């Protein structure tokens, strides 16, 4: 959406000069018995701000795909294929980012470039949860099983460059553990991929404008929210957010943890919460024995295989003392790790739409509702809550993609 330009007028140069002379006591036609003013040295100009160090390491072409090929990939979603206007070239990028310990690491991602005649916006697309045995679903492989293969490729074909980070732990950094649902590293890896994408476009003379849109669902929704916050805090001038549309993310981690520990219903997602706990224990150096978190025999099983099957009842899986510590916030270090990964309570400046299925039992709807209420309470005027009625975590995903595209198309 175009902004109205407002003209600004300044005083004519002679008036400014006269005012300056008057302030010095030497205005024309004025006599003064005051001593001659001491010459004042002009203020020293601030040193030039050094541009940020480049992050792009390398690139390689994966392939080029026609609108007809891309449309065929989404034939099961009505009308989506008709949006594909341009052929799309897909590249694999490697770039430098920081791991959770602050050390530099080479990461990777995919860039989807429409063969378009004019400069286009950039979408940063953050993918959802990938289990360790789903490595080849990471964006830089561009496999037919990846999120970016179908609908996201069509988004590129509408006239958007798409920046799709693998995240740490996949692609070029697959030897490292993925910091699952760790807000800070998901945000920095995504921001640095966005920087690398724009560096690549400049290098290859690919026309992009200044618009940056942020999309992602599930873990990608959480990463998108964390990325939006980071960009507005650290990159407001160089990577301004035009609009973002996170979907079904676990934004209110501390409340989500209490919800799990209070639940008496079967929870299908407990294995992923085990992964979150393992990540936070490692990243924040809590170094608790597994017996602190889990009852037997699951503590022993998870020691042997971190991704072994766990029961669906929280009371059966988690140690009673641990459950109580979460519910009463009686473990300050643990509580601090959860709060550090809350990304729901801040004031976004750019337009933000929160999409979430109302019947989501994997990442409950209250995560988006809490974010909306907290942001509005802080004075955010451009945040919207977009419920997907009756949608579960999985059935709402196609609707999210279509509605998120419609949302960003306004800007």
Annotate each predicted stretch with a short phrase.
Residues 34-118:
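Catalytic-loop region of hydrolases
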Residues 100-108, 112-158:
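Short, surface-exposed "cap/lid" segments of acyl-processing enzymes
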Residues 109, 227, 350-352, 364-375:
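Short alpha-helix in the alpha/beta-hydrolase fold that links the catalytic acid
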Residues 113-116, 195-215, 236-239:
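Gly/Ser-rich "nucleophile elbow"/oxyanion-hole loop immediately N-terminal to the catalytic nucleophile
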Residues 180-202:
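Alpha/beta-hydrolase active-site loop
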Residues 247-345:
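Accessory cap/linker subdomain of secreted extracellular hydrolases
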Residues 348, 353-360:
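Short beta-strand/loop motif that positions the catalytic acidic residue
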Residues 359, 380-400:
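Histidine-bearing beta->alpha loop at or near hydrolase active sites
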């Amino acid at each position: 959406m175009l902004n109205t330009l407002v003209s600004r007028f300044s005083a004519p140069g002679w008036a400014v000069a006269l005012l300056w002379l008057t302030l010095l006591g030497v205005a024309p036609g004025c006599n003064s018995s005051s001593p001659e003013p001491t010459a004042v040295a002009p203020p020293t100009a601030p040193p030039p701000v050094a541009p940020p160090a480049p992050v792009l390491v390398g690139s390689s072409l994966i392939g080029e795909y026609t609108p007809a090929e891309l449309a065929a990939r989404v034939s099961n979603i009505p009308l989506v294929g008709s949006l594909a206007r341009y052929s799309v070239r897909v590249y694999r990028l490697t770039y430098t980012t920081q791991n959770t310990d602050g050390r530099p690491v080479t990461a990777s991602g995919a860039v989807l470039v429409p063969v378009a005649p004019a400069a286009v916006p950039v979408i940063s697309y953050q993918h959802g949860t990938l289990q360790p045995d789903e490595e080849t679903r990471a964006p830089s492989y561009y496999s037919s099983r990846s999120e970016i293969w179908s609908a996201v490729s069509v988004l590129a074909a509408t006239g958007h460059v798409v920046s799709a980070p693998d995240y740490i732990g996949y692609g070029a950094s697959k030897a490292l553990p993925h910091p699952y649902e760790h807000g800070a590293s998901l945000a920095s890896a995504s921001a640095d991929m966005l920087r690398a994408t724009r560096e690549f476009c400049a290098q290859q003379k690919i026309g992009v404008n200044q618009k940056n849109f942020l999309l992602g669902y599930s873990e990608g929704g959480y990463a998108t929210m964390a990325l939006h916050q980071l960009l507005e805090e650290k990159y407001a001038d160089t990577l301004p957010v035009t609009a973002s549309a996170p979907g079904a993310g676990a934004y209110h981690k501390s409340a989500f943890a209490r919800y799990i520990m209070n639940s008496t219903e079967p929870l299908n997602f407990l294995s992923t919460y085990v992964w979150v706990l393992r990540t936070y224990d490692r990243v924040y150096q809590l170094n608790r024995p597994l017996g602190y978190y889990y009852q037997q025999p699951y503590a022993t099983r998870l020691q042997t295989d971190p991704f072994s099957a766990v029961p669906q009842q929280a009371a059966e899986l988690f140690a009673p003392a641990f459950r109580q510590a979460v519910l009463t916030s009686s473990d300050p270090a643990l509580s601090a790790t959860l709060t550090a990964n809350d990304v729901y309570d801040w004031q976004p400046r750019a337009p933000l739409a929160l999409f979430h299925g109302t019947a989501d039992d994997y990442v409950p709807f209250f995560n988006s509702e809490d974010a909306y209420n907290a942001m509005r309470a802080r004075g955010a005027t451009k945040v919207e809550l977009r419920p997907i009625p009756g949608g579960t975590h999985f059935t709402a995903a196609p609707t999210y993609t279509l509605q998120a595209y419609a949302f960003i198309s306004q800007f």
